[in-house]
């Protein structure tokens, strides 16, 4: 028996497909999402509809984004779902979520069992639309969830942690074992809730500066800030912002990275 075949569909490795089949896990995820009629519900990667069906039972309509044309066609001909679904057959990395929100006239509620091979870049894509998103619930590799939620001095704290926590409050929901999927992945999974801040706790004037800073710092995470950020700040300039130059990237809080990004932004403005 080919364990990559589920409900007659062969899971495609290039799309990172692993299909959820554990009913108790499905029920727990849908309860966490708590979809309601009238809300702008968007699912990324509905696959064979394990989450789509129970969510659709609770709403009048929803949008699904599915790259796999065979799965999109399957959903379009589904006897129960076809009348409720707006199917967008394209790569979620190319979707304008602000336009989707504008069409519905309200912020989106986004959820999905994200393919592990695109989960991090897809979240960075979604962060640029947080003004149009009410909340997000994602099934991810457990390691990625750890990176999302970890704080300074934590083993998993990194650039993803800083950028995600800049935009969103992040709440772990539940852990999911490999046996809950077909085919079973080689890693544990977890569900996480991301709620974009209505008011950013540490506003940054130029987000490109925060992106630059975190890339420089975490790409050389074993170096001290004196070395990794030495081309941008002297030890004295770091000290003026309350940062010890002998610290490493993982020791610096989101607030302090935002403070440094604003210093860089002000410096750029003064040079213009």
UniProtKB/Swiss-Prot annotation:
- InterPro entries this protein is in? KsgA/Erm (IPR001737), rRNA_Ade_diMease-like_C (IPR023165), rRNA_Ade_Mease_Trfase_CS (IPR020596), rRNA_Ade_methylase_Trfase_N (IPR020598), rRNA_adenine_dimethylase (IPR011530), SAM-dependent_MTases_sf (IPR029063)
E.C. number: 2.1.1.182
Q: Tell me where it resides.
A: Cytoplasm
| PROSITE patterns (UniProt xref) | RRNA_A_DIMETH, SAM_RNA_A_N6_MT
User: What's in the keyword line of the UniProt record?
Assistant: Cytoplasm, Methyltransferase, RNA-binding, rRNA processing, S-adenosyl-L-methionine, Transferase
Protein's UniProt keywords contain Phosphoprotein? no
Could you give one GO CC term from the UniProt record? cytosol
**GO MF assignments:** 16S rRNA (adenine(1518)-N(6)/adenine(1519)-N(6))-dimethyltransferase activity; RNA binding
Record has Ribosomal protein as a keyword: no
Identify the enzyme class.
transferase
Which residues of the sequence carry a binding annotation for S-adenosyl-L-methionine? Answer: 18, 20, 45, 66, 91, 113
List the catalysed reactions. adenosine(1518)/adenosine(1519) in 16S rRNA + 4 S-adenosyl-L-methionine = N(6)-dimethyladenosine(1518)/N(6)-dimethyladenosine(1519) in 16S rRNA + 4 S-adenosyl-L-homocysteine + 4 H(+)
Instruction: Tell me the Gene3D superfamilies matching this sequence.
Output: Ribosomal RNA adenine dimethylase-like, domain 2 (1.10.8.100), Vaccinia Virus protein VP39 (3.40.50.150)
Summary of the function given for this chain in its UniProt record: Specifically dimethylates two adjacent adenosines (A1518 and A1519) in the loop of a conserved hairpin near the 3'-end of 16S rRNA in the 30S particle. May play a critical role in biogenesis of 30S subunits.
Regarding protein family, the annotation reads:
Belongs to the class I-like SAM-binding methyltransferase superfamily. rRNA adenine N(6)-methyltransferase family. RsmA subfamily.
Q: What is this protein called?
A: Ribosomal RNA small subunit methyltransferase A
- Source species of the chain: Sodalis glossinidius (strain morsitans)
Instruction: Write the lineage as a comma-separated list.
Output: Bacteria, Pseudomonadati, Pseudomonadota, Gammaproteobacteria, Enterobacterales
Q: Which gene encodes it?
A: rsmA
């Amino acid at each position: 028996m080919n364990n990559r075949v589920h409900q007659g569909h062969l899971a495609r490795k290039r799309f990172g497909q692993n299909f959820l089949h554990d009913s108790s896990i499905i029920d727990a995820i849908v309860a966490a999402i708590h979809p309601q009629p009238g809300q702008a519900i968007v699912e990324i990667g509905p696959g064979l509809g394990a989450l789509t069906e129970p969510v659709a039972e609770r709403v009048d309509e929803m949008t699904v984004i599915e790259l796999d044309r065979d799965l999109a066609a399957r959903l379009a001909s589904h006897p129960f779902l076809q009348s409720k679904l707006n199917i967008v057959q394209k790569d979620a990395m190319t979707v304008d979520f602000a336009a989707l929100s504008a069409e519905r006239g309200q912020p989106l509620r986004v959820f999905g069992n994200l393919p592990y091979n695109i989960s991090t870049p897809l979240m960075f894509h979604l962060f640029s639309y947080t003004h149009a998103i009410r909340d997000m619930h994602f099934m991810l590799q457990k390691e990625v969830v750890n990176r999302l939620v970890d704080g300074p001095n934590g083993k998993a704290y990194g650039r993803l942690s800083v950028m995600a926590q800049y935009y969103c409050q992040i709440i772990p929901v539940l852990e999911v074992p490999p046996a809950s999927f077909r085919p079973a992945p080689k890693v544990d999974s977890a569900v996480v809730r991301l709620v974009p801040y209505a008011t950013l706790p540490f506003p940054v004037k130029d987000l490109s500066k925060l992106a630059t800073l975190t890339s420089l710092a975490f790409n050389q995470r074993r170096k001290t800030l004196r070395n990794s950020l030495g081309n941008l700040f002297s030890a004295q300039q770091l000290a003026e912002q309350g940062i010890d130059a002998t610290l490493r990237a993982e020791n610096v809080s989101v607030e302090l990275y935002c403070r440094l990004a604003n210093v860089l932004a002000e410096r750029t403005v003064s040079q213009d």
